[in-house]
């Protein structure tokens, strides 16, 4: 279980990015974070694994309060937390396989990783995850030769190669077209179910979140203003999360995408799941 208690992040100049956020997420649960730009979604994800240091509050993972850990202990704890980034965060000049194996860096000494001497079992595991994400034939290709969707799949394989208990996913579809976005979300959900992973997914596309997430948390100005099932995310709740004007703009954007044949609606995503 992941338990977040009264988590707050203040920046210089008294800017408050998170205001007393409290959440409990069970093993195997996939939670979507939605909200307007600047709501604190990415900050929350990064405060959990301390890529950003929280100002106050607690983050408990398997009985350990992460903000209280020393750097050495934090490195060990981060083995349990896989991260998937919006901009992929791949090393462009390295091969797909080398990027996936970089997910094991937290388990080995500097020199072993420098010379890329990974145990055979870890190489086999990397091949397994490349097969699961549909990139086994590209294992020796440089990362900069891949499409956006393929790069995100490498990022997923790398995170899973850690054998984590938690997946922290920051805008995995922001740079992808609607069809590829649905494919990536479907893959993420399948792998989380297969591994019983707890996952938090920061996602900008509301219909996509409604289709794929089992629980949705809405943030506005650093505070939780909605926490419930996708079926409870009605017009009133969405207006509370985004504000009336921004929600109208988002609705218009989704309608325009649909009219162009790039529909990212709930029906299409559900069809993708069922298919």
Curated annotation (Swiss-Prot):
Top-rank taxon, per record: Bacteria
ABC transporter domain residues: 2-246
A GO-annotated cellular component: plasma membrane
InterPro entries linked: AAA+_ATPase (IPR003593), ABC_transporter-like_ATP-bd (IPR003439), ABC_transporter-like_CS (IPR017871), ABC_transpr_PhnC (IPR012693), MetN_ABC_transporter-like (IPR050086), P-loop_NTPase (IPR027417)
Location within or outside the cell: Cell inner membrane
Catalysis: reaction(s): phosphonate(out) + ATP + H2O = phosphonate(in) + ADP + phosphate + H(+)
GO molecular function: ABC-type phosphonate transporter activity; ATP binding; ATP hydrolysis activity
UniProt-listed Enzyme Commission number(s): 7.3.2.2
Predominant location category: membrane
Membrane topology: Peripheral membrane protein
Keyword Cell membrane: yes
Binding site for ATP: 35-42
Keyword annotations: ATP-binding, Cell inner membrane, Cell membrane, Membrane, Nucleotide-binding, Phosphonate transport, Translocase, Transport
Subunit structure: The complex is composed of two ATP-binding proteins (PhnC), two transmembrane proteins (PhnE) and a solute-binding protein (PhnD).
Function: Part of the ABC transporter complex PhnCDE involved in phosphonates import. Responsible for energy coupling to the transport system.
Family classification: Belongs to the ABC transporter superfamily. Phosphonates importer (TC 3.A.1.9.1) family.
Protein name: Phosphonates import ATP-binding protein PhnC
Gene expressing this chain: phnC
